[in-house]
């Protein structure tokens, strides 16, 4: 870590320093919010969780060698230095902004309803052909995760690819004001988090706030196949550039051919008319859109067509996200990290590419509000339309999903109250050679199911 002195940190978060002022000129060697990760020379920011008051762990961090602590509680006279602030959550963002601005680098900001993480991985894979790239860790994309990602940036970072996720109005500006993106990418406007945003237009309004913090001379890259994004007008005098499959897209994919679970082949045409054939090495036609987004960002940052192609074709597979696992008894399509109605249907499409019996193990989709029952039912109908052989619904919200799936002529549908009930039934319902999709919202803990299937 570099260029973060206690004095500059105090100034950045508008805090009041208490303690030995001789350390004000010293630089911290790390910033953490998890007291268990404190090492000598670190700054600990005490952020209270829903169930835990982080301030009670301050003595432990001091014993572990913390140089200083950021607190929103007045700790009075202490034998260790601390910075008193109004809000430690805001202080974390302010310190992250200070650190981000200490780098001479480009920042790619990514948001959208579906595909943020997979698009982030694709863009990072492309840019890594030319630059030292730092990317969001996993899906650390919220008001705590974004700062953690920024603090972990190596000093030689040339491009940061930062994912930003929101589920309430007002959150995006708090994130984008920290990241200050040079390139803004929006993957799509779906129906995730309707419980809070109410309409797709509300989602668009919040997601597009990222562009307000774009740096001068920046670029806006949007999914031209999205019916709302394709209508966006110039923002801050910058006209959007579109990626997708339509004639309105400056970066376009055609000749799209599924290659089973190997991925999808396509031809990608760049803004200057250059085109190349490539294999997107992750199953699902929807992944082609991510590849074209990667091509658009790569082109904008000066990569050649051959570098872009190499980045797309070397995309690593990530557990929980369209991850193929082959065991002695079955093929598992591990897409269990998260779920919404659009991504559920896309994963069913991927399952349909497999050869042999197809099983969809589907769990609750969260944050759908009053539309939850209808949207779960739609997924069940879709599974039946795609002739999935067996649909297993897990969780209270999947009653409607199972009911609609069971109406399919070729589809058997079973409901389970929880993960344990399903796991106990596995020997009775699955067969050797099955292709098994595992997908649900994050809170359903479906990695537990993936692990159980792997252990068979």
Features from the language model and the residues they span:
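Phosphate-binding loop of NTP-binding sites
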Residues: 7-11, 91-224, 228-238, 428, ...
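ATP-dependent carboxylate/acyl-activation modules
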Residues: 110, 319-321, 443-451
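Short beta-strands and strand-loop turn motifs
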Residues: 72-73, 105-108, 134, 185-191, ...
């Amino acid at each position: 870590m570099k260029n973060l002195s206690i004095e500059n940190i105090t100034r950045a978060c508008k805090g009041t320093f208490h303690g030995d002022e001789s350390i004000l000129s010293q630089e911290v060697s790390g910033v953490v919010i998890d007291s268990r990760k404190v090492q000598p020379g670190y700054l600990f920011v005490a952020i209270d969780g829903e169930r835990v008051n982080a301030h009670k762990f301050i003595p432990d961090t001091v014993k572990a060698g913390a140089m200083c602590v950021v607190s929103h509680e007045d700790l009075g006279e202490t034998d260790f230095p601390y910075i008193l602030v109004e809000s430690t959550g805001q202080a974390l963002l302010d310190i992250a902004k200070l650190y981000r601005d200490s780098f001479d680098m480009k920042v790619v900001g990514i948001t959208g309803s579906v595909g943020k993480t997979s698009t982030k991985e694709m863009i990072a894979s492309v840019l890594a052909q030319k630059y030292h790239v730092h990317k969001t860790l996993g899906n650390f994309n919220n008001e705590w995760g974004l700062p953690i990602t920024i603090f972990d940036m190596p000093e030689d970072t040339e491009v940061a690819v930062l994912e930003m996720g929101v589920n309430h109005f007002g959150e995006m500006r708090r994130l984008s004001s920290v990241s200050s993106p040079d390139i803004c990418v929006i993957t799509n406007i779906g129906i995730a988090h309707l419980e809070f945003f109410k309409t797709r237009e509300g989602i668009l309004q919040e997601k597009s706030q990222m562009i307000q913090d774009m740096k001068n001379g920046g670029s806006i890259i949007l999914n031209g196949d999205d019916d709302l994004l394709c209508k966006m007008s110039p923002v801050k005098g910058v006209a959007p550039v579109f990626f997708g499959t339509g004639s309105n897209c400056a970066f376009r994919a055609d000749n799209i051919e599924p290659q089973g679970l190997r991925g999808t082949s396509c031809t990608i045409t760049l803004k200057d008319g250059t085109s190349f054939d490539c294999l997107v090495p992750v199953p699902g036609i929807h992944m082609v859109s991510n590849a074209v987004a990667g091509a658009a960002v790569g082109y904008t940052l000066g990569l050649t067509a051959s570098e872009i192609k190499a980045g797309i074709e070397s995309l690593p597979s990530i557990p929980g996200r369209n991850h193929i696992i082959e065991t002695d008894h079955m093929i598992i399509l591990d897409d269990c990290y998260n779920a919404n109605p659009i991504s559920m249907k896309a994963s069913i499409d991927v399952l349909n590419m497999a050869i042999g019996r197809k099983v969809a193990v589907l769990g609750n989709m969260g944050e759908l509000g009053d539309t939850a029952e209808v949207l779960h039912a739609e997924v069940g109908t879709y599974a039946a339309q795609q002739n999935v052989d067996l649909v297993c619904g897990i969780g209270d919200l999947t009653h409607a999903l199972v009911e609609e799936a069971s109406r399919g002529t070729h589809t058997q549908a079973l409901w389970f109250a929880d993960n344990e009930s399903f796991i106990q039934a596995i020997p009775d319902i699955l067969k050797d050679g099955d292709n098994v999709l595992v997908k649900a919202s994050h809170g359903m803990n479906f990695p537990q199911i993936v692990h159980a299937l792997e252990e068979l």
